[in-house]
Amino acid sequence: MEGVSALLARCPTAGLAGGLGVTACAAAGVLLYRIARRMKPTHTMVNCWFCNQDTLVPYGNRNCWDCPHCEQYNGFQENGDYNKPIPAQYLEHLNHVVSSAPSLRDPSQPQQWVSSQVLLCKRCNHHQTTKIKQLAAFAPREEGRYDEEVEVYRHHLEQMYKLCRPCQAAVEYYIKHQNRQLRALLLSHQFKRREADQTHAQNFSSAVKSPVQVILLRALAFLACAFLLTTALYGASGHFAPGTTVPLALPPGGNGSATPDNGTTPGAEGWRQLLGLLPEHMAEKLCEAWAFGQSHQTGVVALGLLTCLLAMLLAGRIRLRRIDAFCTCLWALLLGLHLAEQHLQAASPSWLDTLKFSTTSLCCLVGFTAAVATRKATGPRRFRPRRFFPGDSAGLFPTSPSLAIPHPSVGGSPASLFIPSPPSFLPLANQQLFRSPRRTSPSSLPGRLSRALSLGTIPSLTRADSGYLFSGSRPPSQVSRSGEFPVSDYFSLLSGSCPSSPLPSPAPSVAGSVASSSGSLRHRRPLISPARLNLKGQKLLLFPSPPGEAPTTPSSSDEHSPHNGSLFTMEPPHVPRKPPLQDVKHALDLRSKLERGSACSNRSIKKEDDSSQSSTCVVDTTTRGCSEEAATWRGRFGPSLVRGLLAVSLAANALFTSVFLYQSLR
């Protein structure tokens, strides 16, 4: 130890370097040990390729796991294929069967899925299953031309197994209705996104504070204008000059023979006492600066104009304000007046002095306002009104998974793959529909069905009797028996009649629509597909669903279908029963909710074109209520007119005040 101490006393730097070396070696050893013995994570978060849901799985199963949400297998190779064989893809008996037993649920909740037997007949449903099986068993002649051959084969199957006319009419009606709802969702999302962006821009621009150099430049411009105003008021009388200092220069065009009396005005005596408190050399410098500025007023005006322009450039486009632009215009006008006075010299008229003084006073007032108001920005302050949809405030498009579309399993049964999933019609019961009250019509039942079952828009919004468009859409008091789930008639909502029940109904049957749907496609305007809307690459979540709820797969026997499998069934007459008191109260509440907008609907519906609009096309209706009559000149020009009158009043008051002060002080 004594030897080590003597060595450290002889070479202190060697001891310090040795300590640092030992510390570095220890740290490197600890780091290498941690790297060598690093523990792999036990679990990791993965994302499902099919339903885009995140799931926590063991680390070893990060490329081979089953999604608990959609029950799909996630395990892929580099070429995109599965990394293990899945026999359920080509063996039908390995697929699990979906239970058709009705689940115990709240009867007030709407039915999200309908039976395929309601939309397609038995023959068309069998044809769809056959097409899927034949397309799945397709083997190309040449593997390199698989895409071309499968497209040709698919077209051949479509031509061979066509839908019948009633099924085709029902499918097209569903597609049309879904297009309307999707267009309304997309447009509403765009308008809300635009409103949120404008609000964010307004908050951002109003909260941005001007930099310090911009505030200093505005204050300097105000001081220059105040100096010009003070010179115009007191420059000729010499109130700021003490008796022994340098005499003040007279303004251009002033009378040099008038010698001011230094002891006649009490204000001048007060200024002399104030200047007497300053040191003598400082007072001399101030008097020299006063005389220099009074003799070079044009240069001071040019300096003020340059200061305003520089402040606007430094502030930038976001902090650009109207008051800064107005102040710059006043400085430019003041510079022009001074140049005109120098050009005219002794022949300058008297009104030019009055105009110059008025402009200087107004510029001083505006400059003071611009220098003080440093936080209020007026960039995108003006808000443009957005387009509203009927019933938008009442929750027309809720964020509940009412429009969720199921993702069928890859290995699912072929029959369940082709079951259509129409949208939920709960928003149609919640919104305020523009409809006219019921009116009795002498038209017959076949005529009303012929008009209602056309593929185009409904020509008339009035319905007689029950007002139901389809034979399968009737109140639950006429259709449902004991033990069945009551369903309501959403197509009665579409047609403008009162709903028969607060619950949505299944898809309509299309019996009797063969004759009405044959020639209607040629005379109707084509629908705008939702895919044509340009979202500019934004990810639009149309069908959000809560994380704890998974969409259920629809079944072909969720609802009671006819025993013989046919669509065209005759319903036996039923004795009308007295509905329960709770159902009557609920129906009355829903009826009063739907009749809120009937006062203005009588006037607005008459203006609609029967060939291009429908009673339920909430997308084409872009105003709320009777907005066409409410948008008068008061709503359009009211704010602008008030602002214009206020600006004219302020300008006139400032002008007359400056003229009065100038005349009284002169």
From Swiss-Prot:
Region entry Disordered, spans: 502-581
Subcellular location(s) per record: Nucleus inner membrane
Stored InterPro entries: Ima1_N (IPR018617), TMEM201 (IPR040041), TMEM201_C (IPR018861)
A GO MF term: actin filament binding
GO terms for biological process, alphabetical: angiogenesis; centrosome localization; fibroblast migration; nuclear envelope organization; nuclear migration along microtubule; positive regulation of endothelial cell migration; protein localization to nuclear envelope
Residue positions where Phosphoserine is found in the record: S441, S444, S450, S454, S466, S477, S480, S529
Pfam families from the UniProt entry: DUF2448 (PF10476), Ima1_N (PF09779)
Nuclear side: 1-213, 319-322, 375-644
Record PTM N-acetylmethionine, positions in chain: M1
Gene Ontology cellular-component terms listed: cytoplasm; nuclear envelope; nuclear inner membrane; nuclear membrane; spindle pole
Keywords: Acetylation, Angiogenesis, Cytoplasm, Cytoskeleton, Membrane, Nucleus, Phosphoprotein, Transmembrane, Transmembrane helix
SS bonds (residue pairs): none
Biased composition (Low complexity): 508-520
Record membrane topology: Multi-pass membrane protein
Predominant subcellular localization, coarse grouping: nucleus
All ranges on the Perinuclear space side of the membrane: 235-297, 344-356, 666
Chain ranges passing through the membrane: 214-234, 298-318, 323-343, 357-374, 645-665
Complex formation: Interacts with SUN2 and LMNA. May bind to Ran GTPase; has a greater affinity for Ran-GTP over Ran-GDP.
UniProt family annotation: Belongs to the TMEM201 family.
Its biological purpose: Critical regulator of angiogenesis and endothelial cell (EC) migration. Promotes the migration of endothelial cells, which is essential for angiogenesis. Interacts with the linker of nucleoskeleton and cytoskeleton (LINC) complex, which plays a vital role in connecting the cell's cytoskeleton to the nuclear envelope. This interaction is essential for maintaining cellular structure and facilitating the movement of endothelial cells, which is critical for proper vascular development. Involved in nuclear movement during fibroblast polarization and migration.
Name by which UniProt lists this protein: Transmembrane protein 201
Lineage: Eukaryota, Metazoa, Chordata, Craniata, Vertebrata
Name of the gene: TMEM201
